[in-house]
Amino acid sequence: MSAVAEITVTPVLVADLFVEGGRMPVYAHLVDHPDARVLVDTGLTQLHPLVADLDPRPYPLDTQDLDLESIDIVVNTHLHFDHCGGNRLFPGTPIHVQRTELEDALNQDGHTIREWVDAPGLTYVPVDGEFELLPGVRLLPTPGHTRGSQVVVIDNGGRPSVIGGDVAVWFGELEEAATEGLRIVHALDPELVWLAHQHEPWRPRAPR
C-alpha cells in the first residue's frame, strides 16, 4: 500500500466511565486525509439503564467544537455502547463495520445497546475482512475483544500507526499480545497505537 504523508489523527474525548474505582476516558479518533475526513468510533450521547453501573459521563460530539457535517466516513472498531452511541448523529453517512460485528450487535443479547446500533437513518457498510478505506488507510480485522473487532491502520511512510479501539484497554495487554487481534497488531510493527481508553498512544519499547 502506498503511503500518504498528509494523514493526521486527532483524539476526541467523548465520555468517561467509572471502572475499577476510577474514571476511564473514552476517545473517538478523527482522521484527516486529503480525500476525506474519517471519524473512528462515536462515543455515546445519552445515558441508558443497561450501563448505569458504569456512571457514564457523555461529552457528545454534537456539543463539541467539531463540524459533524465535515465527516465523510464513520468507522466503528466494534459496536459496544461506548463506541457506537453517537452513530445516530450521522444519518446517511457511511458507517464501516465488520459484517460479523454488525450481525452480533443486532442479534446477540448483551452485546450492546441494540437501539443505538439500529438508530433510524443509519447507513452501515458491512466489511468482510481487510479493506482499503482510502489510500494509506485500511481496516484490519482483529478478533479478541469481540469476534468482529477491527482496527484502522494508517500508513504515513515508515512504520504504520494504528487506531485500535478496544484491541487493548490497558498498555500491558499490548505488551503481552495474548489474543489473535493483538498478535495481528504486533505483526504490523506499529510506531504507535491509539486506544479508546488511554489518553496517550502506546509506543513499543525500544529494544535493549
What name fits each language-model region?
Residues 94-99, 162-165:
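Short hydrophobic/aromatic-enriched beta-strand-loop microsegments
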Residues 11-16, 26-32, 38, 128-157:
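Core dinuclear metal-dependent hydrolase active-site scaffold
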Residues 2-3, 45-46, 51, 59-82, 97-141, 176-191, ...:
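Metallo-beta-lactamase
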